[in-house]
Amino acid sequence: EQSNQNPVYYCQYAHARICSILRKLQNEGVKIRKPSKDELMLLSSPEEKDLISHLASLTGLIILAANTYDPAKITHYAGELATKFHRFYNAQRVMTDDESVMQSRIFLCNCVRNTMKNVLSMLKIQAPESM
């Protein structure tokens, strides 16, 4: 089922949406670069902080899932990551006039994209770039 009620579709859609955002930015001539540490400090909204915190929790979660023989923890993490990304995307504009904020948000999107791709790969699920 292709709806937000299907957790696999929901996670794949988050990945595809990020890929679409990055393509759109590149098509509009935005030069994507790694932001400085000072620029990354601009990621201060509740949605950004929540997303960053969730990204940082992955390593510990993988260890816990392995130690407890509970791969469902990874599945749950992927769903939460998709939800947190969609919440961020609905609350914050990635493309802004403030170059530093924009580059930091692009970097955050890339971190989510890479993490989602890796988590889906652990679950043997494809991460499509478009849907």
Task: Name every feature range the model reports, one short phrase each.
Residues 1-131:
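Non-catalytic interaction-recognition regions
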